[in-house]
Swiss-Prot record:
Protein EC: 3.5.1.3
Protein name in UniProt: Omega-amidase YafV
Cited SUPFAM superfamilies: Carbon-nitrogen hydrolase (SSF56317)
Matches recorded under CDD domains: Xc-1258_like
UniProt key word Cytoplasm: no
Family: Belongs to the carbon-nitrogen hydrolase superfamily. NIT1/NIT2 family.
Domain CN hydrolase: 4-234
Domain of life: Bacteria
UniProtKB keywords: Hydrolase
A molecular function GO annotation: 2-oxoglutaramate amidase activity
Source species of the chain: Escherichia coli (strain B / BL21-DE3)
Functional description taken from the UniProt entry: Hydrolyzes alpha-ketoglutaramate (a-KGM) to alpha-ketoglutarate (alpha-KG) and ammonia (specific activity 6.65 umol/min/mg), has weak activity on L-glutamine, almost no activity on deaminated glutathione (dGSH) and none on glutathione. May function as a metabolite repair enzyme.
């Protein structure tokens, strides 16, 4: 059964400067080989800016760059960007394969405390991406607080979060990532940014990968621009879910 080698890039972002951010990640991705999935933070071309979509790089430009990086690294490249679409502005999580196939998920839960819901259109569909034998559920930042949306119906193996999660609530980030892994009996990975943004908001990072029993198998140092690597085991995941099949006793409800 295939394992999954995942890399999280915990990095600062240049405020509202798409080309500068792409150049930064060009440098971070240089020389990375032998990975299956490489993850960048939420809104990696701009930082978490409410006006980002209006002045953002075009989706085609971002996708072309991600495709080139996916081919270079022979890996799925994943991260969210602010985009202007025909139906409105979205916070779109893009997952791009080396062959050019593009998967996307539009952030469902918009952070009203900074009026994200007034600037962006919420997504309305869960997406499962199948990649190299793994089923991946992409989610974005504030989605983490809403467990029904990430409820595992035995339809995914890895919940993958990207975020701009502020330092004052870092305890919530760490606790909720662990909770999502335990309750869903799945791997969870969360890639957060570091540094400060144009609004003076500070970010610790605390990016991590957690196994289905809630054990942290890789974690990034707080406030450090770094990368972390982990290898996920499908055999271990299946063995645990078979030996402790709590998912079979889940309440029968569905809200989407």
């Amino acid at each position: 059964m295939p394992g999954l080698k995942i890399t999280l890039l915990q990095q600062p972002l240049v405020w509202m400067d798409g080309p500068a951010n792409l150049r930064h990640f060009d440098r971070q991705l240089e020389g990375i080989t032998g990975r299956d999935v490489i993850v960048l933070p939420e809104m990696f071309t701009s930082g978490f800016a409410m006006e980002a979509a209006a002045s953002s790089l075009a989706q085609d430009d971002v996708v072309n760059w991600m495709t080139a990086k996916a081919q270079q690294c022979n890996a799925l490249i994943a991260g969210s960007v602010a985009l202007q679409t025909e139906s409105g502005s979205v916070n779109r999580f893009l997952l791009v394969e080396p062959g050019g196939t593009v998967h996307f998920y539009d952030k469902r839960h918009l952070f009203r405390m900074v009026d994200e819901h007034l600037h962006y259109k919420a997504g309305n569909a869960r997406v499962i991406v199948e990649w190299r034998g793994w089923r991946i559920l992409p989610l974005v930042c504030y989605d983490l607080r809403f467990p029904v949306w990430s409820r595992n119906l035995n339809d995914y193996d890895l919940a993958l979060y990207v975020a701009n999660w502020p330092a004052p609530r870092s305890l919530h980030w760490q606790a909720l990532l662990t909770a999502r892994a335990i309750e869903n009996q799945a791997y969870v990975a969360g890639c957060n940014r570091v540094g400060s943004d144009g609004n003076g908001c500070h970010y610790r990072g605390d990016s991590r990968v957690i196994n289905p029993q809630g054990e942290i198998i890789a974690t990034a140092d707080a406030h450090q621009a770094t990368r972390i690597d982990a290898e996920l085991s499908m055999a271990a995941l299946r063995e645990y879910r078979e030996k402790f099949p709590a998912w079979q006793d889940a309440d029968e409800f569905r809200l989407w």
